[in-house]
């Protein structure tokens, strides 16, 4: 599931952040994933049950922190599935246009992108959800075929494109910063790393299906680390060839299949007029087709992660029993899958991709940061619990994982932080209103210590919402984010007052 078609072009499509140094962005992102992957591997061998980071934190850091991580994972999987579904729709339009079949824009884009409703995006979510409801056995066979197809196309592109690499295109390898944070230079590399981090989303989702894996204590760590290594090599080689066959400025501002298509168009010889005639025009269609299939697996694994996390949270009483109901025929959480099918389908049909896409990386990075922190906790609180794999060089590896992920998060836009904090505050409201009252723990979060921690976290989030709002207003202005800023300030001050009242009352 790590081998996906996104990430490789995202840095270019968003005005160009890195230039040829995109390979460094992948290296930094992979480094952060490696640290987090080692921590995930220890937990997967120690606690081989569904729920991913939520379950790990529930067993080591308590219910409140587990809720925060679980709610963050819901954001991560929801926006990831939404973003990829919208992108799938765009690539489908491009593929059909190559066959001289033209779909009306009104039915392939949301209202903010010049359409009415994105029907293909909605339909692919429905199809993948129904696939998952039938069980992961069929999904695994389908996913295996897709991975084989994607890896084959990547290798074909690399092999055919290697001889067209022009080393002059790597100069300058790190373009000078434009004066704007995150546009080229070192800050651009870090922002690029945070964006392409989405391409590595997968090994954490793999751990959500631990209950359905044969011999999870042995196979989960192996699957996580080996897949991470293989995909890092594939991504970096692919990016190296892309930036070698075409100058990085050729990718800026392109839409659709442009990142790969532009590179393929440069894989040829110039004619008498100086125009390059591509030697492999068929490769474009093959790339688009593999991306379409590749996106299917990405959508499927994110939808799988969503339902499994909610399944675990419902088992613990933090969410209604609806989410833990198992279908007798298929032995899957069908009701939960259907709910997320509707939610993600509607988001994919009516929300612009740019809004959902910006949230994916920051949610993932936050979850990874907390998992790395959980390893430090579990080594002190549960040192004697058997595990077939141990994170090496503790506390160095977890600390490096925390620092790497936080560093990438800091270079994401301020409005992305605002949306994250707003989402977490909403989650805290649900925990206070339902989770604490229905927790299956003897006391749940309703202890003096738990209440103090809850109130402090709520107050910190509210203050952080104010800070990020002011940061965005000062650096970018009101602009298109005026509504978001107003909502964030109202939400922040309301919650500041609420949690200060709770602290005073205690």
Language model segments and positions:
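Single conserved hydrophobic/aromatic residue that forms the stacking wall/gate
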Residues: 1-12
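Membrane-helix boundary/coupling elements in multi-pass transport proteins
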Residues: 10, 72-90, 195, 200, ...
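C-terminal membrane-solvent junction of multi-pass transporters and transport-like membrane proteins
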Residues: 113-116, 323-332, 368-419, 426-462
């Amino acid at each position: 599931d790590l081998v996906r078609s996104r990430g490789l072009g995202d840095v270019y499509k968003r005005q160009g952040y890195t230039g040829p140094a995109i390979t460094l962005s992948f290296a930094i992102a992979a480094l952060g994933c490696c640290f987090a992957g080692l921590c995930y591997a220890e937990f997967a061998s120690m606690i081989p049950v569904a729920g991913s980071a939520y379950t790990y934190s529930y067993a080591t850091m308590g219910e409140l922190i587990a809720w925060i991580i679980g709610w963050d994972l819901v954001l991560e999987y929801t926006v990831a599935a939404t973003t990829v579904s919208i992108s799938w729709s765009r690539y489908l339009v491009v593929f059909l246009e190559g066959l001289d079949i033209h779909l009306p824009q009104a039915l392939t884009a949301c209202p903010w992108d010049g359409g009415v409703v994105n029907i293909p995006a909605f339909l692919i979510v429905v199809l993948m959800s129904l696939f998952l409801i039938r069980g992961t056995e069929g999904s695994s066979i389908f996913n295996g075929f897709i991975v084989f197809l994607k890896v084959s196309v990547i290798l074909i592109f690399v092999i055919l494109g290697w001889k067209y690499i022009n080393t002059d295109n790597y100069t300058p390898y790190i373009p000078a910063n434009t004066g704007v944070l995150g546009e080229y230079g070192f800050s651009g590399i870090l922002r690029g790393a945070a964006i392409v981090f989405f391409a590595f989303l997968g090994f954490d989702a793999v751990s959500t299906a631990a209950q359905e894996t044969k011999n999870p204590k042995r196979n989960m760590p192996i699957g996580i680390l080996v897949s991470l290594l293989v995909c890092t090599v594939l991504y970096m080689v692919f990016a190296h060839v892309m930036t070698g066959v075409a100058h990085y400025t050729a990718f800026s501002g392109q839409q659709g299949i442009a990142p790969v298509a532009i590179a393929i168009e440069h894989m040829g010889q110039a004619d008498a007029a100086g125009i390059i005639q591509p030697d492999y025009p068929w490769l474009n269609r093959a790339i688009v087709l593999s991306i379409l299939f590749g996106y299917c697996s990405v959508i499927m694994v994110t939808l799988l992660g969503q339902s499994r996390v909610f399944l675990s949270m419902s088992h613990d009483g933090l969410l209604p029993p609806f989410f833990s109901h198992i279908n007798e025929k298929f032995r899957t959480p069908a009701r939960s899958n259907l709910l997320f099918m509707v939610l993600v389908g509607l988001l994919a049909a009516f929300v612009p991709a740019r809004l959902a896409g910006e949230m994916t990386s920051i949610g993932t990075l936050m979850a990874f940061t907390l998992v790395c922190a959980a390893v430090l906790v579990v080594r002190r609180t549960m040192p004697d619990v058997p595990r077939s794999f141990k994170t090496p060089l503790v506390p160095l590896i977890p600390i490096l994982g925390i620092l790497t992920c936080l560093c990438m998060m800091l270079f994401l836009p301020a409005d992305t932080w605002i949306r994250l904090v707003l989402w977490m505050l909403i989650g805290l409201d649900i925990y206070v209103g339902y989770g604490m009252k229905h927790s299956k723990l003897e006391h749940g979060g309703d202890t003096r210590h738990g209440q103090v921690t809850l109130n402090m976290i709520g107050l910190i989030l509210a203050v952080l919402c104010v800070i990020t709002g002011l940061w965005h207003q000062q650096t970018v202005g009101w602009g298109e984010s005026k509504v978001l800023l107003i909502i964030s300030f109202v939400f922040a001050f309301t919650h500041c007052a609420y949690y200060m009242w709770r602290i005073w009352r205690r």
